[in-house]
Amino acid sequence: MYRLIFEKRELDNLNKLQKQIKERIWKKLQDCKENPLKFFERLVGDKSFKLRVGDWRIIAEIDVSEQIIKILKVGHRKNIYG
């Protein structure tokens, strides 16, 4: 099973979201821990991956050899890619 590692700022951003949104994102991340490549999509021209949770996006790096999902960004889809 993969481990989740958050950038400190992104963990703070996640905790600032409304409870319902935060729980939905957290549940999706827990589901991804078994096989993240099933849920995450690779970003074009980048080594990062994205996960869609409704209108919210999670940008992460996935290290298969170490079995780590490193969360780089959490945000609304209109703001996340800028």
Regions found by a protein language model. Give the residues of each.
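A short, surface-exposed loop/turn module that caps and links secondary-structure elements
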Residues: 27-52
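Enriched for short, Lys/Arg-rich terminal
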Residues: 1-23, 53-56, 61-82
